[in-house]
């Protein structure tokens, strides 16, 4: 295997647990709060999944057998094809023919992707108010979105000749976004084609052995050397036998302000809670998937999820299966109040175009952040995340220096609201973001009473800025 040989770099970190744990969480990641995830690959050509329900609903209602057979994740199309009596196989045979192999999507994808204009994405993500974006450089199907010098062990030409990764990174940075890369380290269905139909098989099919360890490591080092990603977003563990501390120190020495997620475990241990993967020995942030936390977490975390129930493009998604901008806004507020980020996914079509309903959601989120972004970006959790008004409107808190933000997750029905368990110091100034007007307020015991402007703006959530008196 050929490897790139970059110029020597300062060795700030050694391949030891003690050394990599000294890596600080960079301010840019803590401050950004919102990232955009992009799942794009061969699975974008069929662009289909059998279910439009979120994974936890399917599992709760019908169990894991139904979940794997009718997987809502369109990016798992190849695994879903392996159920001979399943809906994906029926869809595939009807539309492409029973002798059409998954790998035959490669020329179709590469032809369609020629229409992709990278700045279209970057401009949209910038308008959304995101601080970073993460692209799937290699998903579980093993196909590479960059012209790697490290060929697939089973199918050497299984990679894009156009440098989709490089163009994505350059376009994102040109628009002021950080660029991160996703890589499925433990799973590659071209190298291990065993069907996954139980949770146990997710982990029993993880690849290992010296050849695959060298292969995955070489890919990551190539991605680091070429693109200097701000986020190393691994998935579904990492091959047993790999020295992840060497990989992490290699990365930190080249990208000192980069971050690494929690999905690089090289041996199975039970996840800390549903929605998390087995914990790695080191990480900068946790990654609950399609779920969240109930309380403020000391450890930085990032929820990842699609606007719909899939990460990859599902052509059957519609307004009923996509989240509205309002739902995403309220989700973001809740996550940020508990020390989290939101990595919100879009699934482009094979030609790079993004569904109009996904675009509508992103632009609605961006419009809200244009007015209320100061209550989100650059903030930290307060002493507690949540309260309510006397009338039951949910409230979430963030803080920034001498300013507290109280965000109402609905529009109150009364002109005067009473926020429970919130005390403002004498001389504090209360304003509603987006309106240049000081609001009248008074303290009543442990509650803060605020008279709102009339009429209130039409908005999914309203942010009060409480500038603490000094």
What spans do the regions from the language model cover?
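Mature catalytic domains of secreted/periplasmic carbohydrate-active enzymes
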Residues: 1-470
